[in-house]
Amino acid sequence: ERTHTGEKPFECPECHKRFTRDHHLKTHMRLHTGEKPYHCSHCDRQFVQVANLRRHLRVHTGERPYACELCAAK
């Protein structure tokens, strides 16, 4: 696979950054187009990547998934 060969055949036509996978290029292109297809159902925030929306949703749910290793606080 391309992961270990360093091959990056997918190039951004705007900034010429290269990617190993076509879907990485498609996600990157949203930075140039301003497209933000992932919308928060609780507020007006919009996101380029679904992972950023999932992280943002914790603001509304109060979820704090990472505990401190020293004091067990989240």
From Swiss-Prot:
It holds the Pfam family zf-C2H2. The keyword Nucleus applies. It is found in: Nucleus. The lineage of its organism: Eukaryota, Metazoa, Ecdysozoa, Arthropoda, Hexapoda. It comes from the Eukaryota. One of its GO terms (biological process) is segmentation. It comes from Apis mellifera. GO terms for cellular component: nucleus. A zinc finger (C2H2-type) spans 1-4, 10-32, 38-60, 66-74. This is Protein krueppel. Krueppel is a gap class segmentation protein. Belongs to the krueppel C2H2-type zinc-finger protein family. Gene3D superfamilies: Classic Zinc Finger. Keywords: Developmental protein, DNA-binding, Gap protein, Metal-binding, Nucleus, Repeat, Zinc, Zinc-finger. GO terms for molecular function: DNA binding; DNA-binding transcription factor activity, RNA polymerase II-specific; zinc ion binding.
